[in-house]
Amino acid sequence: MDNLNINFINDDEHPIPSQDLLLKCLQLVADKHHISHAEVNLNIVSNDEIQQINKQFRNKDKPTNIISFKFEKPQGLPDDIANDFLGDIVIAPAVLENEAKEQNKELNDHWQHIFIHGLLHLLGYNHQDDQEAEVMENLEIQLLAQLGIANPYIEQENQNGR
């Protein structure tokens, strides 16, 4: 795992799961995509901060659980610079905590799910339409199963009448 790195940015010291737990998620995603070197910034922020980011970049004036920013290498940057950098993930722990309670999920399980979700966005996965969402959700379910975490979408499907 020496070639996989998460830069934790948690200036206000919000409570988060162990770094090893999240690094294991990165390892799973990297292995699945045959990635041997990867670096990610994980920014831990308040609800107010993520609401501002959500408004600025997604035109949604409300807090959200996670926002991912895939790294786009600027033209002219030498190939050997930032080759392994996937991008930035911003997470609001208070939103995750509320969601976990509302959905009767273990908090660490929900963290792992949402972090994997964000990592997949950095690799180009999306859920803009039903087909893309199905591909992304199925991959999340598969990766979470390797961590011993149940399908996080089952309860939501039942609530949504799917």
From Swiss-Prot:
Listed EC numbers: 3.1.-.-
Its job: Single strand-specific metallo-endoribonuclease involved in late-stage 70S ribosome quality control and in maturation of the 3' terminus of the 16S rRNA.
Keyword Acetylation: no
Cofactor names: Zn(2+)
Residues given in the record as Zn(2+) binding sites: 117, 121, 127
Organism: Francisella tularensis subsp. tularensis (strain WY96-3418)
Gene Ontology, cellular component aspect: cytoplasm
Presence of the UniProt keyword Endoplasmic reticulum in the record: no
Subcellular localization: Cytoplasm
Protein name, entry field: Endoribonuclease YbeY
